[in-house]
Each structure stands twice: as C-alpha cells, then as structure tokens.
Regions:
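Substrate-positioning beta->alpha
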Residues: 22-23, 40-63, 70-73
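Core catalytic loop region at the nicotinamide-binding pocket of NAD(P)H-dependent oxidoreductases
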Residues: 61-76, 96-101, 126
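Conserved beta-loop-beta element that borders a ligand/cofactor-binding pocket
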Residues: 1-20, 29
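Terminal hydrophobic/aromatic helix or amphipathic segment near a protein terminus
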Residues: 90-134
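Substrate-binding strand-loop-helix patch
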Residues: 45-52, 72-92, 103-114, 150-153
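Amphipathic terminal alpha-helices
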Residues: 134-161
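A short C-terminal helix-loop "cap" of Rossmann-like NAD(P)-dependent dehydrogenase/epimerase domains
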Residues: 27-39
Length: 161
C-alpha cells in the first residue's frame, strides 16, 4: 500500500471502548460479575482507547498532513491489565467494588480452547489469548499530537458513553 503512490497512514488502535461493539459489551457484562475467573488471572497488559478518540483522530488524520507511511498507535492514557480494566468498568459503570479475580491456569485452559472458541463465538480462542499475551500498550505521543490533547484513560470512559 505504501508503495502505491498514494499517501498512506496507518492507525493501530488498542482495545477499543465503544458502546455497541461486541468486545466492549462483553467486557461491560463481565464487569457486572462479583467474581471473575480469568486466564492467568487477567494479567495481560492493555491500554484501552475510547472509540470517540479513535474517530476524532481518524478525522484529523484525513485533514492533517502526516508523513507518508506514518503509524499512529491509538491507545488510552492509562496502562492497565485486563483484570484492572474490568475492575475499572465495574467501579465506574456499575458503581460496585472491584471483583474478586481467580486465576485460571493457562495449562488447564489450552485443551479446552476448541470448545471455548465455539461457545464464546471466538472471544476465547487460541488467537484471542495470543493477542492478549502479546499485550496492547503503546506510547501515546503521536496519538496525542493528532488529537491535539491527551487521550482519555479507561477511568474516564464512563463520562462519554
């Protein structure tokens, strides 16, 4: 694409918080639970980004000249873990104390992944666990410059449904 002669920029969003999105709605539902059983105790690094920030940055990228081939990592201002993110959603959206988190050892989960892939509609699959294990955090400097401000952190998402 970059070699096509067209001016190309790449947007790489982290985990996106946006009501109506399948993964976001799943996280909101999980955050209602007082006890969570999460692979590896939910110790996967995340830096969730609000959908409004992504949309605003994409609009700005369409109108602001960025260097050809620029990659903008779109991540929120708060680095957290999956377990902490679910606790933040529980506290800010549901006004409940942080959930108890029990760790599901990866060794016990792996043999069940073909079945969990089917019953979870792909949310709990070998691929999704691989993505979680890789983490989804990034420097937000370029993203903040495109936005013209710091991106929202997960603790602020409830203000902008």
């Amino acid at each position: 694409m970059c070699a096509s002669g067209l001016r190309v920029n790449i947007a790489r969003p982290s985990v996106v918080f946006g009501r109506g999105g399948a993964s976001c709605e799943l996280f909101i539902k999980l955050a209602r639970l007082p006890v969570l059983v999460l692979p590896a105790g939910g110790r996967f690094d995340l830096q969730p980004v609000h959908a409004n920030d992504v949309a605003e940055a994409l609009a700005n990228m369409a109108t602001q000249p960025l260097p050809h081939g620029a990659v903008v990592n779109m991540a929120g201002s708060l680095k957290t873990t999956l377990a902490e993110y679910l606790a933040i959603l529980r506290q800010t959206l549901h006004h409940r104390a942080a959930p108890a988190v029990w760790a599901l050892p990866m060794g016990l989960l792996r043999p069940a992944l073909p079945l969990t892939n089917i019953v979870s509609n792909g949310f709990l699959s070998q691929g999704s666990l691989k993505l979680l294990a890789q983490g989804s955090v990034a420097d937000t400097g370029d993203f903040a410059r495109v936005l013209g401000r710091e991106p929202l952190g997960a603790e602020e998402f409830y203000r902008y449904p």
